[in-house]
Amino acid sequence: YDAITASQGLGIGLVDFTGIAQIILRVRVNKVGAGTQSWQLWNETDANEIGVIADAGAAGVKALQATFTVSLVGIKQIRVRAKSTTAGDDPVFLGAAVLPIVA
């Protein structure tokens, strides 16, 4: 992740994880090429992965979603990071949203 500058600028957010049991990540992307592209929800505050969506499907614009169980407490800065298994197929990020689910 963060191999190219564009991957480092995919937006950030602040979430208070106190009392949160799960977080839903939805990313809107334009998948280019045939490799597997991974979209990671990254806890920037603690330098830990919250979860990853791996997309090995067909190319094109799509919305991907996953739910991750969390056991974090307090306010964390989070961001989306991306990578591809194929060097020339840089992921194209179109937007993201997170939805915290209370325990």
What does each model-found stretch correspond to?
Residues 1-103:
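Polar, enzyme-active/binding microenvironments
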